[in-house]
Structures are given as structure tokens and as C-alpha cells.
Amino acid sequence: MKLLAIYLLLVLSPSVTWMGDFSQAKNEAAQKHRLILINFSGSDWCGPCIRLRKEILESDAFVNYASDHLVLVRADFPRQKKNQLSKEQVKLNEALADKYNADGKFPYTLLVDENGKVLKDWDGFPNETPEQFIAQINSFVQQPK
């Protein structure tokens, strides 16, 4: 019985998908009338990036919220050979960085609308709880258009 409960929790738990193509993310955001959260990360070398992912972006509270309210885009810039991205993904990430993160900040997170207009940004690790992070995003989600 316990195994069944665990299985159901895993299957029924909300999940989120981090996209790698900003154009596709904008299309999805337009179709679903959602905002886009872009996260620039160095997943295998940037301590604050890893902390942001583990403490906020992978928290149950954020995953539950994002699954219903956001389109997520991750532009990752790993350094270790075992984590190398495809050449196509590297080009997509570099193009996104040219547009939104020319200074090369890590971590750098932005909330943008479906047209790509920046609504809010977080430079570095946001020293707050997942709930506080969500509240900041939610203030833009609930604004009339």
C-alpha cells in the first residue's frame, strides 16, 4: 500500500519542463497566456546557480506554481566536458545571452512577457524563500494587461 501511495504521489505530482528554445517558449507563452521565466546558469561550476536550482527552482512550492503559471527557459553554460550541450543548444543559449545577459552574470534570472519584454530580473541568488520568490512573480501574473 505504501508503494502505491508513493507511486501515485510521483505520477500525480506536478512537473515542469525547462525549455531550451526561447522562440518555442514565446509561442507557448502566447498560446497559454503565461509569462516566461529565463534562468541563465552554469550548472556544473556556479555555486549560486546550483543553490538557486536546488533551493528555489526545484522546490515543491515553485514547481507547483510554475506548472500552472509559467513557461520556463534555461540557458545553461556548463564547463565540464561530460555536461557539454549540443552545438545547436549552445547557439540558442548564446543568442539568448546576447539579448538578455550581455554582461554574463550567473545566476541571472528574468521574468519576461510573451513578447520578450523584461518585467523583473534577479541578479545572483535571490536571498529569499521559494514562497517569496513566487510572490514577486505572482505580482506580475495578476496584473491586468
Task: Walk through the language-model features, giving the residues of each.
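Sec-dependent N-terminal signal peptides
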Residues: L3-S13
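Typically the conserved alpha-helix immediately C-terminal to a functionally engaged Cys/Sec
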Residues: C49-Y65
